[in-house]
Amino acid sequence: MRTLALLAAILLVALQAQAEHVSVSIDEVVDQQPPQAEDQDVAIYVKEHESSALEALGVKAGVVCACRRALCLPRERRAGFCRIRGRIHPLCCRR
């Protein structure tokens, strides 16, 4: 019984030491990352004489589109998808 209690105590100390090491590593990684702006929308304007993939999606010339991080605004429709820093987001165009 004493052996079991001793092994349990050693296991708890080892787990606590490992947890402290992981939290320090996470703090170091967070400190190394550059600050990012939360709302970075990318606006796209399609010129009249420019043939592009947007026109193939049904987006007409002269339409302003934006790559949104969340949902499209009420006066916009989703015309496809785009990427911001490697993540896929909706491509929203004004109606």
Swiss-Prot record:
Disulfide bonds join 65-93, 67-82, 72-92. The keyword Protein biosynthesis does not apply. GO terms for biological process: antibacterial humoral response; antimicrobial humoral immune response mediated by antimicrobial peptide; cellular response to lipopolysaccharide; defense response to fungus; defense response to Gram-negative bacterium; defense response to Gram-positive bacterium; defense response to virus; disruption of plasma membrane integrity in another organism. PROSITE patterns: DEFENSIN. Keywords: Antibiotic, Antimicrobial, Antiviral defense, Defensin, Disulfide bond, Fungicide, Secreted, Signal. InterPro entries: Alpha-defensin (IPR016327), Alpha-defensin_C (IPR006081), Alpha-defensin_N (IPR002366), Beta/alpha-defensin_C (IPR006080). GO terms for cellular component: extracellular matrix; extracellular space. Pfam families: Defensin_1, Defensin_propep. The keyword Ubl conjugation does not apply. It is found in: Secreted. Residues 20-62 form a propeptide. Belongs to the alpha-defensin family. This is Corticostatin-3. It comes from Oryctolagus cuniculus.
